[in-house]
């Protein structure tokens, strides 16, 4: 492996010690991308396509170096040249491709599939400005764009592009890839679709306001654009269809290249629909299969064996639904298919609450997923039980075999190996390194639960971490805090319906 000094000599014609932190960051970016690409390989004929409106992947440099087994080596080489890997990591902008638990779940599954050597790629959109950057000015929130794409980034521009037709215009998608490294595993891909016609100058200076009607120029500017008006709501449908249409065309191309005859699509692909944003992939795939010669009934059967749905919403009334006239305007080609899907459900089940189009002419996206997919999962056991017992009980009675639970843990390679090296060292010493690939191995720690020496070391490690946090708070916030403080830390944007609100009220009460 060519190490950092050699890369700096080659790229900048000077040694590592003479490079700026920025130069070293870009050298490491090149090196990591090259090494990750070498771990790609076709693995068997079947592949998972994980379609999601968001992927909260976090900064990638440290994560990729850990997964490639290079973090310690690179850190030592940088230290020998008088450089600090922590300062270099700070230079990397965080990809603005996700927001919350839904996006983190997607990123965790990609990480996990690559680590388990499973063939599974992500499919999403290449947002340029993310959700928004939150700043407070005189106690009021100001939203500003959150750009992250630079000339050199983790994005790899491909030659893959597909036409995507809406009711009133056709755009051409362009696919960008980000490599997803597994821990000592394979490299998969996150496919992100974009448009070459995007125009960032549509955004009004320092705000997140823009012309929501110019679809060819605004399509991938923001994640979840403001939907408080009709143009914003329509834009969300444009975004969703753009993602699934380009994604469906990619999936069919890849499967056909492996020998799929379309009748056997389910032997080549499984499509995981992460929440309801990608639901239109179901009617879109049916449309494409019919266009390519399958009859409608068979196309529906094939797609139903290929798609699965992850539910994130506990309340039935909060599930995504769109007026028929919105869909007729944006994706008129899908409405006849959605009507056929609804008709099939109505013929089979008298219960109106499970139909797809209700009497107010509203299309219920989750209902498409449940009827025309082979699996419905919740994301925590209590959540799944509530879905089965109350919120989706009508569907559970029809399809008990479809409902299952998938609880997501944490990606401990980031939150333990990288964030807490001292604790990692202690664990290695106590139980070996198997836990780095199999979290169940952490149960071996129970043998030490009464070991005073081990418990003392845990307290020491925790205290040292609190001292580091106090130093950071003093440097960045100008606040001096005692390391004996109890810290309750929440690292999301401040939000009006999250636990932070309760915390703020509680603090104002006790102080």
Task: Cite the ranges covered by each PLM segment.
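A conserved ligand/cofactor-binding region detector
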Residues: 1-510
